[in-house]
């Protein structure tokens, strides 16, 4: 028992990124051997696939209640304050997140990516044919019974009820707010536990994918990662630069490079916007910004300024759409941009938060929850790099927008 406890503690205290890399490596090797018609390896892969299915099943079970609680509690608990210029910062956060999502959609159309998914035959039956059908389905999903929405994984209904509950309880008693905060923290702990098991699940998923499709599957992940990282860099150096220039009419790059050097680099390694708040506060002080403003805007940005998350949600959702050969028009893509931006605002405070909101975007196109959760699992496979870049973009943009809003106000 002592040895088991020691091994468990060693695993839980270990570096998740390294553990996931080990899982990917072992799964890839095992899958490759099985792909070359090794009977023994194929038997092991079949057993390993159970780990992948269990991981996806756990994600599928926790995701609906997670989305509801995170979005509702973020509206109920967050105190926005009255600091001068805060309204401008909130507008910048929302506009920046939407433009990031729109950029991701455009890049995905130019460089379409596909994934290796299982059991996709049933997913095509419910694919919508036009924006009218999408909007009709959207409206009916919004008025779904909240209990049914959570139990069936209707993420549009969940989001609608979460926002409604948040607004309705915005001015509730301190005790009520504390209950929602405690529930939110409890759900977050459950998700963290599931994420800790990711190396085993990813081992099973990679082994199964490579055994079925060879290293073609891993090549698909590499292209997907290239599109994700490329889009995030485009947002950081082009979209954000355009926003800064539009607001200040000054060369944006000195400020952008300062934010990347002193905020993004730290966030890249911590992979947490919340953990990077002290770093951002220190940078704001160094830039001589208004303390009353940044003391509110930086923690707020760690919650709602999620450009990187919006990119992840949009790119991975469109990868699923491409894989299933669903035709997407301009208005469909615009609606996806809006939904991805709204969903991204609720992605903070939990490991892999942006990935857990992918089913919300996928549901716009009638993609089943089973398929959407396979896409989430793919996100965890590439998450070693994706999550780091995403957090770096999210966190550094908090300081960037606070700085330009301070100049404006």
Swiss-Prot record:
Keywords: Amino-acid transport, Cell inner membrane, Cell membrane, Membrane, Symport, Transmembrane, Transmembrane helix, Transport. Its main location: membrane. GO terms for biological process: serine transport; threonine transport. The keyword Protease does not apply. It is found in: Cell inner membrane. The chain crosses the membrane at residues 14-34, 57-77, 89-109, 149-169, 190-210, 224-244, 296-316, 338-358, 365-385. Disulfide bonds: none annotated. It is a multi-pass membrane protein. GO terms for cellular component: plasma membrane. InterPro entries: Na-dicarboxylate_symporter (IPR001991), Na:dicarbo_symporter_sf (IPR036458), Ser_Thr_transp_SstT (IPR023025). It catalyses: L-serine(in) + Na(+)(in) = L-serine(out) + Na(+)(out); L-threonine(in) + Na(+)(in) = L-threonine(out) + Na(+)(out). It comes from the Bacteria. GO terms for molecular function: neutral L-amino acid:sodium symporter activity. Involved in the import of serine and threonine into the cell, with the concomitant import of sodium (symport system). Belongs to the dicarboxylate/amino acid:cation symporter (DAACS) (TC 2.A.23) family. This is Serine/threonine transporter SstT. It comes from Campylobacter fetus subsp. fetus (strain 82-40). The lineage of its organism: Bacteria, Pseudomonadati, Campylobacterota, Epsilonproteobacteria, Campylobacterales.
């Amino acid at each position: 028992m002592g040895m088991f406890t020691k091994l468990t503690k060693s695993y839980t205290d270990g570096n998740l990124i390294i553990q996931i890399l080990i899982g990917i490596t072992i799964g890839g090797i095992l899958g490759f051997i099985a792909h070359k018609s090794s009977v023994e390896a194929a038997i092991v892969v079949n057993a390993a696939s159970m780990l992948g299915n269990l991981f996806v099943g756990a994600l599928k079970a926790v995701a609906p209640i997670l989305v509801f609680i995170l979005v509702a509690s973020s509206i109920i608990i967050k105190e926005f304050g009255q600091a001068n210029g805060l309204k401008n910062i909130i507008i910048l956060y929302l506009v920046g997140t939407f433009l990031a999502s729109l950029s991701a959609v455009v890049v995905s159309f130019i460089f379409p990516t596909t994934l290796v998914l299982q059991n996709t035959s049933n997913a095509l039956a419910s694919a919508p044919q036009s924006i009218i059908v999408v909007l009709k389905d959207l409206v009916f999903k919004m008025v779904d019974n909240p209990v049914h929405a959570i139990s069936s994984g209707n993420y549009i209904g969940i989001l609608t009820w979460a926002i409604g509950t948040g607004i309705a309880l915005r001015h509730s008693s301190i005790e009520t707010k504390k209950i929602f905060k405690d529930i939110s923290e409890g759900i977050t702990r459950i998700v963290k536990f599931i994420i800790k098991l990711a190396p085993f699940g990813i081992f099973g998923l990679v082994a199964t994918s490579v055994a079925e499709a060879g290293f073609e599957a891993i090549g698909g992940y590499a292209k997907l990662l290239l599109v994700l990282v490329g889009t995030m860099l485009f947002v950081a150096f082009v979209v954000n630069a355009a926003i800064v220039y539009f607001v200040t009419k000054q060369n944006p790059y000195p400020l952008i490079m300062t934010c990347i050097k002193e905020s993004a680099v730290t966030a890249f390694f911590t992979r947490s916007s919340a953990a990077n708040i002290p770093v951002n506060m220190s940078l704001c002080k160094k830039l001589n910004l208004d303390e009353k403003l940044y003391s509110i805007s930086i923690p707020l940005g760690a919650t709602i300024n999620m450009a990187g998350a919006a990119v992840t949600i949009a790119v991975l959702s469109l990868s699923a759409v491409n894989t299933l050969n669903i035709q997407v028009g301009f208005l469909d893509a615009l609606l996806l941009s809006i939904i991805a931006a709204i969903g991204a605002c609720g992605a903070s405070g939990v490991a892999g938060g942006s990935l857990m909101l992918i089913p919300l975007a996928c549901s716009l196109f009638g993609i089943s929850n089973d398929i959407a959760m396979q896409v989430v699992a793919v996100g965890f496979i590439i998450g070693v790099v994706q999550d780091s870049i995403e957090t770096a973009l999210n966190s550094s943009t908090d300081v960037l927008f606070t700085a330009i809003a301070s100049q404006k106000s």
